[in-house]
Amino acid sequence: MLHSHTYRDMKSYDYSAANVRYEFLPSDASQLYQLFNKSHGVDVTIPPEQNLHNWVDPESPYFQAEIRDAIFSYEARSQKSERLKVCISTREMDEAAWKYAHHSQVILDGTFGVCSSRLLLFIAMGIDEQGKGVPLALFLFSAPTGNQATHAGYNREILRELLDKWKTHLSKGRDTIFCPYVAITDTDTKERGALQDVWPDIWLLLCRFHLRQCWTNQRKKILSGKVS
């Protein structure tokens, strides 16, 4: 909204001489979210998966081709027993995957607080020439119905399925099968097992931060006498 100058009175003053400050009240946050959602065609009165389906359905009046083109795998949740599954990778991300991860290194990690809905997000990343992380693919899926904890709503099978779809997507139309040689994860055995299922010869490394965290937590337990 700053770039589009849509805040109140922003279009009426001289930017070179303006000395203006905006005071945001607690009530402004919800109003800004509503304006943002409306400007992006998000209907907050319906479930998020229904918004997504409207964007990728060519027959929907809310169809958005750029979103449809960025999704290489989509499974709607039509019944309570099913999961919503969305795999996202733009053309630029596909090119980066071949440049930075094929016959090289990939990083896989998950996060569980991406929104108020019970959704899990796993991100595949590569490392560029400057040593910075580059997103290669996003794997978004819902927790099973009745699952009490979102962070426990996944297993080796669902990760294997989504990683295999990513591999198939990247390898389509090419003479070479997409294959990273090394993967870095945290200590989650489900992530590590799924990677080995899709690429049996891959070398698995532990993230140094998570490894140090495990050692620290275990040391605290031992020193506190809580380890039996």
Language-model segments: which ranges?
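DNA-binding interface regions
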Residues: 1-228
